[in-house]
Amino acid sequence: MQALIFDVDGTLADTESAHLQAFNAAFAEVGLDWYWDAPLYTRLLKVAGGKERLMHYWRMVDPEEARGCKVKETIDAVHAIKTRHYAERVGAGGLPLRPGIARLIDEAGEAGLPLAIATTTTPANLDALLQAPLGADWRRRFAAIGDAGTTAIKKPAPDVYLAVLERLGLEGGDCLAIEDSANGLRAARAAGIPTVVTPTAFSAQDSFEGALLVLPHLGDPGEPMPQHVPGAANRWADLAALRAWHHGTLIEAT
């Protein structure tokens, strides 16, 4: 394992509730009579990308209106307002990283293991989420960052992963990806990257066929995984465990 590549939303932090609240706040601000509840948003998450999700929903509820000439302009405006609301919610550090994430980032830095990000979210959302827990210079901790500002085609297409691999100068099999959703898993696997999946409540019902390992989270000494996982000396993932899993076979833990 020569590099570790993280997805962001749902993987680094359980962000989807904050995104959902931000979407609904944006709808109210612009006067749209839309409201997304958690079950609906769970289904909409099958569509990667916030703007793409908005267009998909618009076509669901009013196909004729969704063909209008100002639809793109409206979606851009709603998404910009949503991004502002999201940044306000997470920017003060109110959204913690998931168990194991901060520790693994530190361990990788100490070991000289390159880290990367492969996400469909925007650079603004990345900054809002990561500045508080990792510091204003958080980007320096990652050898490559692929996001919505660098790669237009969203997951499950592998484009963002392929772009990150090119920047790292590595093959897919040299790396390990950490994802939380079926779309993310499909994208990473299409790029040839072995993948560990840590679902959230919004993705727990996804199919993770082809994942190297499925875990509730990566664990920490103070918040261990519910059970021991083969290849891990403790009930949390450290670099030694990740390397063991990278070279291992299909295991599933719940």
From Swiss-Prot:
InterPro entries given for it? CbbY-like, HAD-like_sf, HAD-SF_hydro_IA, HAD_sf, PGP-like_dom2
Q: Which CDD domains match?
A: HAD_CbbY-like
**Can you name one GO molecular function term for this protein?**
hydrolase activity
Task: Spell out the family assignment given in the record's similarity comment.
Answer: Belongs to the HAD-like hydrolase superfamily. CbbY/CbbZ/Gph/YieH family.
Which PANTHER family does the record cross-reference, listed alphabetically? CBBY-LIKE PROTEIN (PTHR42896:SF2), XYLULOSE-1,5-BISPHOSPHATE (XUBP) PHOSPHATASE (PTHR42896)
Q: What is this protein called?
A: Protein CbbY, chromosomal
Task: Say which species the protein is native to.
Answer: Cupriavidus necator (strain ATCC 17699 / DSM 428 / KCTC 22496 / NCIMB 10442 / H16 / Stanier 337)
Species classification:
Bacteria, Pseudomonadati, Pseudomonadota, Betaproteobacteria, Burkholderiales
Name of the encoding gene: cbbYC
